[in-house]
C-alpha cells in the first residue's frame, strides 16, 4: 500500500493545527522520504540517512501538537521524550538510551497488535470452547498416583503458576449435549451476562522501586517477569468480559514472539521516529557553572544516538542509523547555536515556527477538528445545554487572548484554554442544576466577564 504523500500528510495536520506550514511541510517531506528510500536497492539504502529536523518557536504555537498528531497519522513506531528528563551518564536519572528502548517497546506493541488481528478469529473460537467447558463442567474423577508421579505433577504445576490437581474431567453424553446447547446460545449472544469463573494471569503488583529503576533506564521487572513463571488467579466475571481476557491469552499462545520481536526491531530501526521536546532546556548558555557542564554532558550523550549507534534492548540490538529524530524547543532564553556544534550538525533541517496572531487565535477556536469551542459545546450538551458562540464573541475572545499574551508571558494557544474556562465558569457550574436550554455567548457577555482581567495587570498574571 502506497504511503501518504507529503501533501496528504499536511492536509491531515491542517485538521488539527493552525498555520505553521513550513514546519508541517518539513515533517511531511522527511516522513515521505522514508517511503522513497524503501524503494531503492539495499546498497543505496544504507547510505541514505534521515535528515533530522530542529523546530524552534515560542511556546504554545504547535510544536508538541505536531508531534502528537504525527503519532496518529504515521503507521510507524513513534515516541515523544523530554530532553530535561535525561541526565549525564554517571548521575541518577534516565540515560539517553532509554528513548531508544521506549521506541523498541512501542514497535513491539504495534507489531503485536497486528499479529493479534491475524489470529483473532482462531482465538475467539478457542475462547468460546473454553467458556463452554467452564459453563458446563465435566464430572471430576480422583487420580490415584504413586508418590513419584505426584511429585512430578506438583513441580510442573508450580512452574506453570497453577495449583496442584489430582482430578481429571470425564464428559458424559448428557454433558456433551448440554455443551452443544450452551455453545449455540453463546454464538447467538444469549449468555453474555452469565457469570463464569476463569483462571487468568495475575497482574503484576506495583513495585515501589519501579519508578527509580525506570528513571535509571533499568527494566528489572520485565527482565525478571520473563524468567519467572506467571502466577494465575481465579476471577468471576460476566461471559462478555471473560471472553476478552481469554481471547487475549489465546492470542498470546497463537503468535510467534520471536518473529514479532524481529519484525519490531526492523520496523523501529528503519521507520522509527523519536521526538525530543524541550531541547532548548539542555543548552549550556553559561558553561562556567556545574549545571551548564551537566547539560552539555546530556547533549554529548544524545550525540552518538542521533549520529547512529547500536543500543541493547530486551528484544535485541537496535541500530539508530535510520531513525528520524525531530527536536523542538522554544529557545526563549537561548538559541539553536548554543547547542554543541556536533549536535547542531545532526539536525540539518531548521524550521522556525511563527508566533500566533489574533487571526490565528480565531481559527484555533473554530477550525480544528474537535477545537476548544466544539469541546465546550459537547461538554455542555451532556447537561442538555445548547451553547452557541456569536462570531463577534469568538473575535473578542481571540483579541483578549492575544492582548494578555502581549502584556504578560506569551504562552501561545494555551492561553485560550484558561480564558475560556474563566469565561464559562458560571455556565459550567450551574449547568447540571438548571433548565437553561440554549445559551448564547455574545460579545457583551465576553466583555462583561473578561474586561477586568485585561485592564487589571495583577489579575492578568493569574490567567496563566
UniProtKB/Swiss-Prot annotation:
Cellular-component GO terms for this entry: HslUV protease complex
Binding site for ATP: 18, 60-65, 277, 342, 414
Residue ranges of coiled coil: none
UniProt-listed InterPro entries: AAA+_ATPase, ATP-dep_Clp_protease_ClpX, ATPase_AAA_core, Clp_ATPase_C, HslU, P-loop_NTPase
SMART domains: AAA, ClpB_D2-small
Compartments it resides in: Cytoplasm
Keywords on record: ATP-binding, Chaperone, Cytoplasm, Nucleotide-binding
Subunit structure: A double ring-shaped homohexamer of HslV is capped on each side by a ring-shaped HslU homohexamer. The assembly of the HslU/HslV complex is dependent on binding of ATP.
Protein role: ATPase subunit of a proteasome-like degradation complex; this subunit has chaperone activity. The binding of ATP and its subsequent hydrolysis by HslU are essential for unfolding of protein substrates subsequently hydrolyzed by HslV. HslU recognizes the N-terminal part of its protein substrates and unfolds these before they are guided to HslV for hydrolysis.
Protein name according to UniProt: ATP-dependent protease ATPase subunit HslU
The organism of origin for this protein: Lactobacillus leichmannii
The organism's taxonomic lineage, starting at the top: Bacteria, Bacillati, Bacillota, Bacilli, Lactobacillales
Amino acid at each position: 500500500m502506497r504511503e501518504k504523500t507529503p501533501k496528504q500528510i499536511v492536509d491531515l495536520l491542517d485538521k488539527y493545527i493552525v498555520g505553521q506550514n513550513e514546519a508541517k511541510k518539513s515533517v511531511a517531506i522527511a516522513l515521505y522520504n522514508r517511503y522513497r528510500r524503501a524503494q531503492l536497492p539495499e546498497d543505496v539504502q544504507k547510505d541514505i540517512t534521515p535528515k533530522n529536523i530542529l523546530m524552534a518557536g515560542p511556546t504554545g504555537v504547535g510544536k508538541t501538537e505536531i508531534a502528537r498528531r504525527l503519532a496518529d497519522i504515521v503507521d510507524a513506531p513513534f515516541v515523544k521524550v523530554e530532553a530535561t528528563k535525561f541526565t549525564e551518564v554517571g548521575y541518577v536519572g534516565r540515560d539517553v538510551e532509554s528513548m531508544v528502548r521506549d521506541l523498541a517497546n512501542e514497535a513491539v506493541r504495534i507489531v503485536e497488535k497486528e499479529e493479534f488481528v491475524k489470529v483473532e478469529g482462531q482465538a475467539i473460537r478457542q475462547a468460546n470452547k473454553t467458556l463452554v467447558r467452564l459453563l458446563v463442567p465435566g464430572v471430576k474423577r480422583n487420580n490415584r498416583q504413586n508418590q513419584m508421579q505426584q511429585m512430578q505433577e506438583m513441580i510442573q504445576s508450580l512452574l506453570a503458576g497453577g495449583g496442584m490437581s489430582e482430578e481429571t474431567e470425564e464428559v458424559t453424553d448428557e454433558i456433551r449435549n448440554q455443551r452443544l446447547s450452551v455453545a449455540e446460545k453463546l454464538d447467538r449472544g444469549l449468555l453474555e451476562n452469565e457469570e463464569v469463573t476463569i483462571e487468568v494471569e495475575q497482574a503484576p503488583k506495583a513495585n515501589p522501586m519501579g519508578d527509580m529503576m525506570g528513571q535509571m533506564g533499568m527494566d528489572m521487572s520485565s527482565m525478571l517477569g520473563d524468567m519467572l513463571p506467571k502466577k494465575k488467579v481465579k476471577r468471576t466475571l460476566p461471559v462478555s468480559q471473560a471472553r476478552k481476557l481469554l481471547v487475549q491469552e489465546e492470542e498470546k499462545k497463537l503468535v510467534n514472539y520471536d518473529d514479532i520481536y524481529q519484525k519490531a526491531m526492523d520496523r523501529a530501526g528503519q521507520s522509527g521516529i523519536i521526538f525530543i521536546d524541550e531541547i532548548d532546556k539542555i543548552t549550556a548558555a553559561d558553561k562556567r557553572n556545574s549545571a551548564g557542564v551537566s547539560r552539555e554532558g546530556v547533549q554529548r550523550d544524545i550525540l552518538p544516538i542521533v549520529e547512529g549507534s547500536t543500543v541493547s534492548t530486551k528484544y535485541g540490538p537496535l541500530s539508530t542509523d535510520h531513525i528520524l529524530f525531530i527536536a523542538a524547543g522554544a529557545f526563549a532564553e537561548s538559541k539553536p547555536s548554543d547547542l554543541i556544534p556536533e549536535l547542531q550538525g545532526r539536525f540539518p533541517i531548521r524550521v522556525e515556527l511563527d508566533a500566533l496572531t489574533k487571526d490565528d487565535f480565531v481559527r484555533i477556536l473554530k477550525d480544528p477538528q474537535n477545537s476548544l469551542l466544539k469541546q465546550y459545546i459537547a461538554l455542555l450538551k451532556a447537561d442538555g445545554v445548547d451553547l452557541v458562540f456569536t462570531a463577534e464573541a469568538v473575535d473578542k475572545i481571540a483579541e483578549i487572548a492575544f492582548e494578555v499574551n502581549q502584556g504578560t508571558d506569551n504562552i501561545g494557544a494555551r492561553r485560550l484554554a484558561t480564558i475560556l474556562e474563566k469565561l464559562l465558569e458560571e455556565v459550567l457550574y450551574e449547568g447540571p442544576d438548571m433548565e437553561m436550554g440554549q445559551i448564547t455567548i455574545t460579545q457583551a457577555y465576553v466583555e462583561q466577564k473578561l474586561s477586568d482581567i485585561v485592564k487589571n495587570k495583577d489579575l492578568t498574571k493569574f490567567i496563566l
